[in-house]
Amino acid sequence: MVSNSDASLNKAPLPEGTLSVGVGLFISGITAYVFFKVGQEALGKEGFKPIVVLWFAAFALMPGFFMPVEQELGRALAHRRALDQGGRPVLVRMLMLATGLGALLLTGLLIASPWLTREFFEGYGIVTLALIIALFAYVPFHLVRGIASGSGRFVAYGLTLGIDGTARLAACTVLWLAGIDSPGPYALAVVLAPIVAIAVVAARHETRTDDGPPAEFSEVSGNLGWLLLGSVMGAALVNAGPLGVDVLADSTETAKVTVFGNGVLLARVPLFLFQAVQAALLPRLARLAAKGDLDEFREGLSLLLKVVAAVAVLGTIGAFALGPPVLDLVYEGGLDRRTITLLALASGVYMVALAIAQAVIALRGHRLVALGWATGVAAFLVVTAVSSDDLYLRVEAGLVAASTVALVIFGMSLRSLMSAGHAPDADGFSDGIADAPLKP
């Protein structure tokens, strides 16, 4: 017999804000694809290469380091809101943490800037400067998103996603129509767009917080260090492909970096379907976790993994069947069926690994998840180095191997934790989402 509470869990509508955030994600994804198209029309594949590298480098570093800060801020603010307490002291604490992380990252970028300019950005120092500027744009961007989610302002959260992508595309289009054919202005468009989103949300008074009791760092997850390591490693892995091609390509193969980046974008389409599935199913799992119902948690998790696996399989089959003609239509091709299929396979395996990683974190396995992503990154480096002399194939093999290694580690960790009777933690789902730093 099913209790009323169980029935309400099964029949519960989508959680508040799902539609707003979903629309924002959709706009963010579409504008990213169009940005790559317009940028290549303006600069050509070779000229657009520094922008491709900037894109994947920025979205490895910024969400990797600051998504956990955003999610922990949101969790702490939501907890205070439930207690009818103001969250400004929490914001101040998280601002201190974000500033410290930003200072460390800034120091590293400044030290590495001559090397980055020479080896990655084709001698364009302004592109390196854009990567540094990204810090000053994305730190407040993630804090604003944390305020929005923790305060229940999901329309504002969706606006940050949509406006960020729209502003970037609008700036790129204006530059193209104006005949600008230097990478510098396009690089600045990539990293300054979040400031537009921040300004719009601030103008709507959606960044306000109220004064409240003093905040201690104990209000932040005690596992923030492991979360941060896992987030950085996971973001590095999902963005490693084009960066790996760039490192291995010679001076005559710059266009191949752009072409590979196009393929990676196309292969990530299932990841955005995953985010929609996640938005629909994870809140129900969180409610089951709050009840401490391990049996129903297992059933809900099984459903999530089946759906995610189905999306991964369909994405890989779709890439095999339709990938080359779609790439020809949108980006004038450049990749064969093997490459786009292996990229989709790697993306699909990564997606399943990500879903399991979130469950492991919900079972308080933060350290295991950090270990899994770090081992995956190590596997990528080893396999890419020794697997083949073919530029694309060695990176494709590295991505598939890395995602598979992470998946195996997470699967074994999940089985071990559940066999040991570890109870899921509702707050862990917030941490789990922080371990998913995705960007088109």
Which functions belong to the PLM regions below?
Residues 2-14, 155-158, 179, 183-189, ...:
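Interhelical loop/hinge segments that connect adjacent transmembrane helices in multipass membrane
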Residues 66-82, 263-267, 271-292, 362:
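Helix-loop junctions and terminal segments of transmembrane helices
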